[in-house]
């Protein structure tokens, strides 16, 4: 049986507010296999972002286990989890979060250089990703000189620079028109399928869900199959 790239087991996550304790995740289980696209839908406030942050090792749950590429992540210290996150997870957000003072190629190369890759090698990898994205002629343009769709394709390339095992996408096409959405998301799907990465996508755009292998929603802190 193929080892999942992500496995959440019995995850509990509670926020403490002035109004009292709010349990967002309650014994939540999730498995994402290599090359699998899993969609997460539901209304705002249902816990989608909390689930993504937990899966991405950005938040620590009160209970449960997180296995990423077979590694028991909650047994690691903060530095260990940070290292795993940088090496094995790629993030794509609704807003591209590109560094405005750097051009496209250096924005993509940045995660590689942070991971210790030499600048020349990092730029070589970034250049090949730009070519796949159809943006080789935009390599030395800063984010402000790119269209919204181009910015998001650069952000996707940056997320894939370290050859992650898992890609986490939070409303990745939320700011794009339908035509650009199809192109950008289609590129993401093609690349992760080729690399065998698992993908967890939270979206309000039901047009994207037709690309998913599974569609889930959160109800009472647990993941269930989404039924239209």
Swiss-Prot record:
Gene3D superfamilies: P-loop containing nucleotide triphosphate hydrolases (3.40.50.300)
UniProt-listed Enzyme Commission number(s): 7.6.2.-
Any one cellular-component term (Gene Ontology): plasma membrane
Compartment list: Cell inner membrane
Alphabetized CDD domains for the sequence: ABC_MJ0796_LolCDE_FtsE (cd03255)
Membrane topology reported for the UniProt record: Peripheral membrane protein
Keywords on record: ATP-binding, Cell inner membrane, Cell membrane, Membrane, Nucleotide-binding, Translocase, Transport
Family listed: Belongs to the ABC transporter superfamily. Lipoprotein translocase (TC 3.A.1.125) family.
Protein name per the record: Lipoprotein-releasing system ATP-binding protein LolD
Organism: Hyphomonas neptunium (strain ATCC 15444)
